[in-house]
Amino acid sequence: MTDASSRPAPALPDVHALLALCEHAARRAGVVTVADRPRDLSVASTKSSPTDVVTEMDRRTETLLREILSAARPQDGLLGEEQGHETGSSGLTWVFDPIDGTVNYLYDIGVYAVSVAVVEGDPAVEGGWRPVAGCVHNPVTGATWTAGRGIGAFLDGRRLTMGEPPALDRALTGTGFGYFTGRRRTQARVVADLLPRVRDIRRIGCAAIDLCMVATGRLDVYFERGLHAWDLAAALLVVEEAGGVVRGIGGKPPAEAMVVAGARPLVDVLAAALEELDADGDDEPAPGGAQD
């Protein structure tokens, strides 16, 4: 029997090669979202609620991403927003959102992104995964954020380094809203309490770009409830490699319950305020006890 301590450690992945594949896949998919977008684009289906929409372009773009990534790395797992999880044998999983900001895309608002990341661990388990490389690409503007573990974060090749944050009352704060009406009531209550405490609040409609804007200095801090691994994986690494932190509240990892991102001192203050407001608590009931 071999002593575990004498076994060779698993080889570290080639971060540069993985990052190049992230960017290649995101850019290829981005071309399709712009060039093949129908003029009469409509909702193909809904998911969690009538406002949680999927277009045919979401499906087409995810299929393309799966084809590109599985051809290049057949041993790796795949997890996409629209078509679910395929496990692999390598310990790496590609996590992607073909169109993050689908409602913006549906309305032809040019703030959406293709998000592609590769992670170690199990992205189906909260706190059970860690990104290795990622790319967030806005196909309309061409803005491309990239990050690799230990090699930094970049916007269009320019290294990103976050500076000292302002106090909370001078912080331009980003957020997003969910799809269930009860969740939205909770979020509205939290925003109503926070708005007098911050410089202002922005709701841009694309979580991956929101997070990258924090890394770029266009937002000071960001919080949102309801995000999944495909929303987070690439942009989380961009924030971390730029010198920021991404966490949950109440000692929890960043996950569906809550994500807070920015420079550590500001994140700690905002996270404490969100915890005080029970921002990750039960959704608000409908007036009069009616069901959503």
Where are the language model's segments positioned?
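N-terminal subdomain of lithium-sensitive/metallo-dependent phosphomonoesterases centered on the IMPase/IPPase/PAP
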Residues: 1-99, 286-292
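DPxDG-like acidic metal-binding loop motif
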Residues: 88-154
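Residue-level signal for inorganic ion chemistry
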Residues: 33-36, 58, 69, 102, ...
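Short acidic/glycine-enriched loop/turn segments that link adjacent beta-strands
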Residues: 50, 141, 253-256
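Generic detector of well-ordered alpha-helical packing
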Residues: 59, 82, 98-101, 139, ...
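An extended, acidic
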Residues: 161-292
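Solvent-exposed alpha-helices and their adjacent loops that cap or buttress functional pockets
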Residues: 46, 86-88, 124-127, 146, ...
